[in-house]
Amino acid sequence: MAEKFTQHTGLVVPLDAANVDTDAIIPKQFLQKVTRTGFGAHLFNDWRFLDEKGQQPNPEFVLNFPEYQGASILLARENFGCGSSREHAPWALTDYGFKVVIAPSFADIFYGNSFNNQLLPVKLSDEQVDELFTLVKANPGIKFEVDLEAQVVKAGDKTYSFKIDDFRRHCMLNGLDSIGLTLQHEDAIAEYENKQPAFMR
């Protein structure tokens, strides 16, 4: 079972960039592992650090600003997560501490992978995202409330509605990844297997 996601209130960091691809999110040299942990240290490695070893922080990159330390909601521009279809991208984001990414649009594969890893991708219109960038930049350290049950983002004195399809919303609310979904039908699977001829088992 994955962690349930119903509502999250967190610090917002504004990454004012469009077409952020998966190689920027987690560069290919860090993809040797197949477990989900440890990738957060290399999130946006080529942007966060001035050296290849990731030891010299780039003071001009927004994730390194003191006011955004501990951020758990990432605000971005259109086509977030484009490029190659590596599942390591949501792994890196969640391992760093992000729970939500808000953007006008996402690459399809990244969008699906995010739900599989309990990272909530929230689509809002370009105009709404513009408003949120203005709000965050004027109020560094502001927190948003993201309510998956009600499908709303509360930011400042405004509320923004978003839509998640019923199946994915059900899975997130109940902490169900693909394994969890399968285990819900464990008895039926066992019954089916027991009915198979011995030579097929």
Swiss-Prot record:
InterPro entries per the UniProt record, alphabetical: 3-IsopropMal_deHydase_ssu, Aconitase/3IPM_dehydase_swvl, AconitaseA/IPMdHydase_ssu_swvl, IPMI_Swivel, LeuD
One BP term from GO: L-leucine biosynthetic process
A molecular function (GO) term: 3-isopropylmalate dehydratase activity
Pfam families assigned to the protein according to its UniProt record, in alphabetical order: Aconitase_C (PF00694)
GO CC aspect terms: 3-isopropylmalate dehydratase complex
Signal peptide: none
The keyword Nucleotide-binding is assigned to this record: no
UniProt pathway annotation: Amino-acid biosynthesis; L-leucine biosynthesis; L-leucine from 3-methyl-2-oxobutanoate: step 2/4
Record's keyword terms, sorted: Amino-acid biosynthesis, Branched-chain amino acid biosynthesis, Leucine biosynthesis, Lyase
Broadest EC class assigned to this enzyme: lyase
EC number: 4.2.1.33
Annotated catalysed reactions: (2R,3S)-3-isopropylmalate = (2S)-2-isopropylmalate
Subunit structure comment from the entry: Heterodimer of LeuC and LeuD.
Record's function text: Catalyzes the isomerization between 2-isopropylmalate and 3-isopropylmalate, via the formation of 2-isopropylmaleate.
Similarity comment text for this entry: Belongs to the LeuD family. LeuD type 1 subfamily.
Identification of the protein by name: 3-isopropylmalate dehydratase small subunit
Organism from which the protein derives: Salmonella paratyphi A (strain AKU_12601)
Gene behind the chain: leuD
